[in-house]
């Protein structure tokens, strides 16, 4: 199985085992953060692709309240200089306030809690002294909770860049989705994960994991006055410095069709660098995100089909149909192999109820029925080179090439939709990342067909439907062109734009680009830009020849560290 979206809320409430002992529900945000990493690591050991937490702030918010409850009672004991005071009633009252209101840290619930605390403090203080100690107690508890939440988010980032999985081969390929939670607790989580990302790793390095996806939603975070607009601005600022978060757009029509207000499990999420699993033709009552994932995908080398068509579009389509049908057969074979497995073959994914409906199965049961909620995807690579081989231009160069490109991808989507209707399984179309295949396919084709200008004359085929990176085009035009393809690729797609200069100094421009992606129908997008780091003073930003902070020249001692998301992408598998 490729990748999965983990429901931490359900997992934490039940408690879970990694095979070496049972872990009960966490009682603080720090322990919840630690267990989230353990869940990702354990699930990764059963799979080869990405692990995603689709509702990060929703899942962890209850544990912010648990930490707050502890901190408040501890501060009261310190203020009263009485470690033995019984505060169980206060603990229960805060739990009830959270249950009734969905928040304990909002202004109106803080007022309710302050009334309770004031009565407790009245046993020792009165008048102005009572008011001063009440103010201190309430503010100090919030301060301690915020500090612990920051440390918890910092730990998530550090752990997911250091803890090993899959027999120690590599760190888990993790991603977290957030952006729409509006309670004080949810906002505290999002703010602090962004601040921890901004701070970087131990020596200031840019963290690669988890891949972070900020969910953009009109009325929630896209304009002044929206409850989370400040967090969207912060996300833009952090992404301008650290490359993450990326941005997913919940109002894209093909995402919005599943959205139910008040149900975050219906908000589209991303696994890894682009994978998307949402629609569910096997069981339309389970068109939700948590507990589902991609079973397998296979990528088609479109440029080879175009080369062999020798300019004949009809021959290309004939070859494409044969190839897609071959992939269908291969994916069905793959499905049968997976379906024949038992729960014990996936001790965490299935044994601990991560995968949807797997909690109904026994240890020796086969997993055939539950995996039908997953997806089987047909991927593709090199649309740009395909168009050059067929008509002499790619889709960034002419409108006619763009129309042909859209027709090709639309045709592939129609084939996957028909296969879904035929089999009852969730077949989908995937704009494959193909970090390895992009070089492998073109090298094989060079040996067979030689150097063909615009097709095999580079060391790679262009990613999925992207306009080639070497082609001189404005960011707006690239977004506008690629945005037309996103709705066709229901298994996932991403669009990048490459920006020059130090975006830290122009967050307004960064924001405009993100929102233009939204306006052009992009479902998932990212802005790529140079990120340099001075190894001497730790400055992060654009460094030409001289570090603007310490004045060190490149080449003096240790070389300046350079990172771009094009380099980061080569690790993507989800």
Where are these regions (language model features)?
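Contiguous, well-ordered alpha-helical segments that form the cores/surfaces of helical PPI scaffolds
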Residues: 376-389, 410
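Conserved catalytic cores of very large enzyme subunits
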Residues: 1-373, 393-394, 398-573
């Amino acid at each position: 199985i490729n990748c999965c979206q983990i429901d931490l809320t359900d997992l934490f409430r039940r408690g879970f085992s990694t095979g070496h002992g049972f872990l009960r529900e966490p009682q603080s945000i720090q322990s919840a953060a630690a267990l989230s990493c353990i869940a990702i690591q354990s699930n990764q050991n059963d799979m080869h692709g990405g692990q995603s937490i689709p509702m990060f702030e929703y899942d962890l918010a209850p544990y912010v309240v648990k930490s707050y409850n502890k901190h408040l009672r501890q501060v009261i004991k310190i203020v009263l200089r009485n470690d033995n005071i019984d505060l169980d009633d206060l603990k229960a009252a805060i739990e009830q306030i959270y249950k009734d209101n969905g928040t304990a840290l909002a202004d109106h619930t803080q007022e309710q809690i302050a009334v309770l605390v004031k009565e407790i403090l009245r046993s020792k203080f009165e008048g102005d002294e009572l008011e001063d100690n009440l103010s201190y107690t309430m503010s100090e508890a919030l301060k301690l909770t915020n500090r612990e939440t920051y440390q918890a988010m910092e730990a998530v980032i550090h752990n997911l860049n250091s803890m090993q999985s899959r027999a120690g081969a590599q760190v888990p390929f993790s991603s977290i989705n957030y952006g729409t939670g509006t309670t004080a607790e949810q906002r505290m989580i999002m703010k602090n994960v962004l601040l921890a990302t901004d701070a970087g790793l131990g020596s200031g390095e840019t963290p690669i994991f988890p891949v972070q996806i900020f969910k953009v939603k009109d009325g929630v975070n896209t304009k002044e006055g929206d409850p989370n607009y400040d967090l969207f601005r912060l996300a833009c600022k952090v992404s301008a410095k650290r490359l993450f978060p990326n941005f997913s757009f919940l109002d894209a029509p093909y995402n919005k069709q599943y959205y139910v207000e008040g149900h975050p499990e219906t908000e589209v999420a991303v696994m890894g660098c682009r994978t998307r699993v949402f629609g569910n033709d096997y069981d339309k009552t389970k068109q939700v995100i948590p507990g589902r994932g991609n079973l397998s995908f296979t990528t088609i080398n479109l440029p080879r089909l175009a080369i062999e068509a020798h300019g004949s579009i009809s021959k290309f389509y004939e070859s494409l149909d044969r190839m897609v049908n071959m992939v269908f057969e291969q994916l069905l074979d793959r499905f049968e192999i997976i379906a024949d497995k038992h729960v014990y073959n996936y001790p965490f994914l299935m044994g601990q109820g991560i995968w949807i409906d797997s909690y109904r199965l026994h240890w020796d049961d086969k997993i055939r029925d539950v995996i039908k909620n997953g997806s089987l995807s047909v991927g593709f690579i090199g649309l740009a080179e395909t168009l050059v081989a067929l008509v002499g231009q790619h889709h960034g160069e002419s409108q006619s090439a763009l129309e042909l490109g859209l027709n090709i991808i639309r045709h592939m989507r129609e084939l996957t939709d028909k296969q879904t209707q035929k089999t009852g399984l969730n077949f989908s179309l995937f704009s494959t990342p193909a970090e390895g295949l992009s070089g492998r396919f073109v090298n094989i084709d060079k040996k067979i067909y030689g150097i063909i200008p615009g097709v095999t004359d580079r060391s790679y085929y262009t990613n999925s439907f992207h306009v080639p990176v070497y082609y001189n085009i404005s960011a707006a035009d690239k977004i506008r062109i690629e945005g037309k393809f996103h709705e066709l690729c229901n298994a996932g797609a991403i669009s990048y734009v490459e920006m020059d200069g130090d975006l830290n100094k122009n967050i307004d421009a960064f924001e405009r680009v993100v929102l233009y992606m939204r306006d052009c129908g992009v479902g998932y997008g990212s802005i790529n830009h140079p990120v340099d780091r001075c190894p001497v003073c730790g400055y992060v930003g654009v460094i030409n020849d001289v570090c603007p902070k310490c004045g060190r020249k490149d080449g003096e001692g240790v070389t300046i560290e350079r990172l771009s998301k094009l380099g980061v992408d080569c690790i993507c598998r989800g």
